[in-house]
A protein has these predicted regions:
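Metal-dependent catalytic neighborhoods of phosphoester/phosphodiester hydrolases
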Residues: 71-80, 104, 219-228
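Conserved beta-strand hairpin/beta-sheet module of binuclear metal-dependent hydrolase folds
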Residues: 1-50, 142-158, 175
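Binuclear metal-dependent phosphoesterase catalytic core
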Residues: 240-258
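Active-site neighborhood of phospho(di)ester-bond hydrolases with catalytic His/Asp-centered motifs
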Residues: 36-40, 58-68, 94, 155-160, ...
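Short beta->alpha connector loops
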Residues: 41-42, 96-97, 136-139, 159-163
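Active-site metal-binding motif and surrounding structural segment of the metallo-beta-lactamase
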Residues: 42-92, 174-175
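Cap/insert and terminal regions of metallo-dependent hydrolase folds
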Residues: 162-245
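Metallo-beta-lactamase
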Residues: 86-142, 149-151, 250, 257
C-alpha cells in the first residue's frame, strides 16, 4: 500500500530554527518505491524515531536547495548507502544544488546516481513515474513534482509565490501536498499564503489535499482550523499534516481516498 509519512511539518525560519515543528520533509512509499522528499534539519533523527529504515530508500529528492529542505541530504545519503559501501540509490536535485552554491558534498557524490532536474522532464523509479511540470517562483531553482503510481497521481507544490500558471500544472492529480508558510503575503518572502493555497486547491480540485510546511503565522492561526475552512470553501477533503503523521493512498472502487 502506498503512503506518505511526514518527518516534519515546519516551515519558515522561526519555526524551523526553534523546532516548533519538526522539519525533516516527508517519506513516500509508492508502489514499493521509497523516496525521501526534502530532508530538512532533523530528518535522519525522525527517520529513526519513526522506525523507518534508511537502507530501504531508493532515492532522495530535493525540490530546492534551501536549508529547511536540504540540510540532511548528506547524512541521509550516508545512511541509505551504508556509508557508501552500497551505492545503489539515486539523488534527484536541481542543478544549483550541485553547482553554484552546492549543498551536496563532493565526497558524497560517488555514493549515488545523480539526476539533475529540468522543467518538463520525466523519470522512472521502479513502476513510479515522476514528472517535473513546472519551475516555481522562488529565490532559488525550485521545481514542482507529480508522482504517478498504481493508486493515482500525487502532486507536490513546494515553496513558491502564487502565479497564474501554477494550478494548470497540477490539474488531474488525485492527491496534493502543498507548502503553506504564511497567512498573509509578504512580497519579500516568496511563499504561498493560506488564501492562495485555498484558491489553488479549488482550481486543481484533487480528491484530497494535505497542508504542510507551516510558518509561525499559520501555527498561531491553527492549521487544522484552516484546513477545515478550505474544505468547506472548496468541497475538497483537506487536512493539516502533523509531525509523524502517515496517510495511506488507497483508492476504493468508488474512487474515494482514505
Amino acid at each position: 500500500m502506498s503512503s506518505v509519512t511526514f518527518l516534519g511539518t515546519g516551515g519558515g525560519r522561526m519555526v524551523v530554527l526553534n523546532q516548533l515543528r519538526k522539519s525533516g520533509g516527508f517519506w513516500l512509499k509508492l508502489d514499493n518505491v521509497n523516496i525521501l522528499q526534502d530532508p530538512g534539519p532533523g530528518s535522519l533523527v525522525m527517520v529513526h524515531q519513526l522506525r523507518l529504515k534508511p537502507r530501504d530508500l531508493d532515492a532522495i529528492m530535493l525540490s530546492h536547495m534551501h536549508i529547511d529542505h536540504s540540510n540532511d541530504v548528506n547524512v541521509v545519503t550516508e545512511a541509505m548507502t551504508g556509508g557508501g559501501f552500497h551505492p545503489r540509490v539515486r539523488l534527484i536535485v536541481p542543478a544549483d544544488c550541485m553547482n553554484s552554491d552546492p549543498v551536496v558534498l563532493q565526497y558524497i557524490r560517488p555514493f549515488v546516481g545523480i539526476t539533475e532536474i529540468k522543467k518538463g522532464m520525466e523519470i522512472t523509479l521502479g513502476e513510479v513515474k515522476i514528472g517535473f511540470p513546472i519551475q516555481t517562483m522562488h529565490p532559488v531553482e525550485t521545481y514542482g513534482i507529480i508522482y504517478s503510481f498504481k493508486e493515482g497521481r500525487l502532486g507536490y507544490i513546494p515553496d513558491t509565490e502564487y502565479f497564474p500558471e501554477l494550478a494548470g500544472a497540477y490539474r488531474g492529480v488525485d492527491f496534493l501536498i502543498i507548502n503553506v508558510v504564511r497567512m498573509k503575503t509578504d512580497k519579500r518572502i516568496r511563499h504561498l499564503n493560506m488564501d492562495e493555497a485555498a484558491k489553488l486547491i479549488g482550481e486543481i480540485h484533487p480528491k484530497r489535499a494535505i497542508l504542510t510546511h507551516f510558518g509561525l503565522q499559520v501555527l498561531k492561526a491553527d492549521p487544522e482550523l484552516q484546513a477545515k475552512n478550505i474544505s468547506e470553501k472548496t468541497g475538497v477533503d483537506v487536512m493539516a499534516a502533523h509531525d509523524g503523521m502517515s496517510v495511506n493512498f488507497e483508492k476504493k472502487e468508488n474512487h474515494e481516498w482514505f
